């Protein structure tokens, strides 16, 4: 196989797959006051069953807050205290902070999978 053909195969493989597939968090960035309820929405357009919320604090790895295995099916992760979730639609999994506190200052990540 010549270098030109190999380059073509690599480009085809990189371009394969659903390019519109995405997981989004809204809002992307958020600064709030202590005690004011807030909701961060996670949305996915891939019809995935499993969705999860994580937080990452300085010097620590990702820690799971809550996860959902399908609509109306949620369970606690490693650090659920101070958070609530709901899953009324397959594509959305909002994370609710009823009364945010300084110890909840963190990076938050949402994920989905089959």
From Swiss-Prot:
Function: V region of the variable domain of T cell receptor (TR) beta chain that participates in the antigen recognition. Alpha-beta T cell receptors are antigen specific receptors which are essential to the immune response and are present on the cell surface of T lymphocytes. Recognize peptide-major histocompatibility (MH) (pMH) complexes that are displayed by antigen presenting cells (APC), a prerequisite for efficient T cell adaptive immunity against pathogens.
Protein name as catalogued: T cell receptor beta variable 27
Residue pairs linked by disulfide bridges in the UniProt entry: 42-110
InterPro entries, alphabetized: Ig-like_dom, Ig-like_dom_sf, Ig-like_fold, Ig_V-set, TCR_beta_variable
Organism lineage string: Eukaryota, Metazoa, Chordata, Craniata, Vertebrata
Subcellular location(s) per record: Cell membrane
Domain Ig-like residues, every copy: 22-114
Entry-listed glycosylation sites: 103
UniProt keyword terms in alphabetical order: Adaptive immunity, Cell membrane, Disulfide bond, Glycoprotein, Immunity, Immunoglobulin domain, Membrane, Receptor, Signal, T cell receptor
GO terms for cellular component: plasma membrane; T cell receptor complex
Keyword Glycoprotein: yes
Alphabetized Pfam families for the sequence: V-set (PF07686)
Taxonomic source organism: Homo sapiens (Human)
Subunit: Alpha-beta TR is a heterodimer composed of an alpha and beta chain; disulfide-linked. The alpha-beta TR is associated with the transmembrane signaling CD3 coreceptor proteins to form the TR-CD3 (TcR or TCR). The assembly of alpha-beta TR heterodimers with CD3 occurs in the endoplasmic reticulum where a single alpha-beta TR heterodimer associates with one CD3D-CD3E heterodimer, one CD3G-CD3E heterodimer and one CD247 homodimer forming a stable octameric structure. CD3D-CD3E and CD3G-CD3E heterodimers preferentially associate with TR alpha and TR beta chains, respectively.
PROSITE patterns given in the database record: IG_LIKE
Residue stretches spanning the membrane: none
Primary localization class, coarse: membrane
Signal peptide: 1-21
GO biological process annotation, one example: adaptive immune response
